[in-house]
């Protein structure tokens, strides 16, 4: 017999969604500000109501049953609609609203001041938390710890960072595409040489450790040509590579996105940018689509929709 929703405590559905996100009774309890015992009791009630285990224990935490997997999208949509309904009376000035962002630097630093002003104009009591994009950021979006991410992906067919490789639960929108440049100080000796692949490879390079990898599409293209660059230094962020490349008497070359020109102008670094010495087909493999990323469950969340549109508008005004 079909059960009526009137026989179910709807608070249990929130517990169910958090269990699906966290795959842990303890972590779900922490987010609900209750004890793990209370979450376990709620899970027992849900199992009885759905007549299904819903989750089973595994070495990686709670593993959802086929029924739970089939309900995930419907549950997320139901929660979105509930949030929309509850948001109505407070849509203009909600208290305690938090914006959790993950972005690579200096991508967010370029517009952080303008974005924060927009947020505080609309939500005066909001708080903003910005973290650097790293190997765990996609999982953080899935876990609900990050509202929206802003990061570059890759276009090389052999890359692990293709847009097509994103998890199915992640939605995205490409804001702009960029091709990296070579950044070197204004008095670098390479500027007095013919700029070609041999010159590019003659000098030591700064590499960015990206999502736990020291190599990226640039190294794939060089490998296809039977060439290799000398990586003398690995750093976690683009702005650090620009800072080091700008140091006096430094022979290091930094390869970073073209948008860093804006960052370079803001901080008046003594750097010039040269194109990577590749043909058009090779340049195409190095194209970086800079992308907003969010979880599908937040596709209609008013806060996330507003944030996406605000970031899009800010970058359009800089183009």
From Swiss-Prot:
Q: Which UniProt keywords apply?
A: DNA-binding, Transcription, Transcription regulation
PROSITE patterns reported in the protein's UniProt record: HTH_LYSR
Which ranges carry the HTH lysR-type domain?
8-65
Query: Which residue spans does the record list as DNA-binding?
Result: 25-44
Query: InterPro entries per the record?
Result: LysR-type_TF, LysR_subst-bd, Tscrpt_reg_HTH_LysR, Tscrpt_reg_YidZ, WH-like_DNA-bd_sf, WH_DNA-bd_sf, YidZ_PBP2
Q: Which domain of life is it from?
A: Bacteria
A GO molecular-function descriptor: DNA binding
User: Can you tell me which family this protein belongs to?
Assistant: Belongs to the LysR transcriptional regulatory family.
| PANTHER family the record matches | HTH-TYPE TRANSCRIPTIONAL REGULATOR LEUO-RELATED (PTHR30118), HTH-TYPE TRANSCRIPTIONAL REGULATOR YIDZ (PTHR30118:SF11)
General function of this protein: Involved in anaerobic NO protection.
The protein's name in its UniProt record: HTH-type transcriptional regulator YidZ
Q: Which species is this UniProt entry from?
A: Escherichia coli O17:K52:H18 (strain UMN026 / ExPEC)
Q: Which gene encodes it?
A: yidZ
């Amino acid at each position: 017999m079909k059960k009526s929703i009137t026989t179910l405590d709807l608070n249990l559905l929130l517990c169910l969604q958090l269990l699906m996100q966290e795959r842990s009774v303890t972590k779900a309890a922490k987010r609900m500000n209750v004890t793990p015992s209370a979450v376990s009791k709620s899970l027992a009630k849900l199992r009885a109501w759905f007549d299904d285990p819903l989750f089973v224990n595994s070495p990686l935490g709670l593993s959802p049953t086929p029924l739970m997997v089939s309900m995930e999208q419907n549950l997320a949509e139901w929660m979105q609609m509930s949030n929309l309904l509850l948001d109505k009376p407070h849509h203009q000035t909600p208290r305690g609203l938090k914006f959790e962002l993950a972005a690579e630097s200096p991508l967010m630093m370029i517009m952080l001041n303008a974005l924060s002003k927009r947020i505080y104009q609309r939500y005066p009591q909001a708080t903003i938390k910005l973290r650097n994009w790293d190997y765990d950021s996609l999982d953080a979006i899935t876990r609900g710890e990050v509202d929206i991410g802003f990061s570059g992906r890759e276009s090389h067919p052999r890359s692990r960072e293709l847009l097509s490789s994103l998890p199915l639960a992640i939605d995205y929108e490409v804001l702009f595409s960029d091709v990296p440049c070579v950044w070197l100080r204004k008095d670098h000796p390479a500027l007095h040489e013919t700029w070609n692949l041999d010159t590019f490879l003659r000098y030591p390079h700064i590499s960015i450790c990206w999502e736990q990898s020291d190599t990226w599409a640039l190294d794939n293209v060089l490998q296809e040509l039977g060439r290799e660059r000398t990586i003398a230094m690995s750093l976690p962020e683009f702005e650090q590579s620009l800072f080091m490349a700008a140091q006096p008497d430094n022979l290091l070359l930094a390869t970073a996105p073209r948008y860093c020109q804006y960052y370079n102008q803001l901080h008046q670094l003594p750097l010039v940018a040269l194109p990577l010495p590749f043909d058009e087909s090779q340049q195409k493999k190095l194209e970086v689509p800079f992308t907003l990323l969010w979880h599908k469950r937040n596709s209609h969340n008013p806060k996330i929709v507003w944030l996406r549109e605000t970031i899009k508008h800010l970058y359009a005004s800089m183009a």
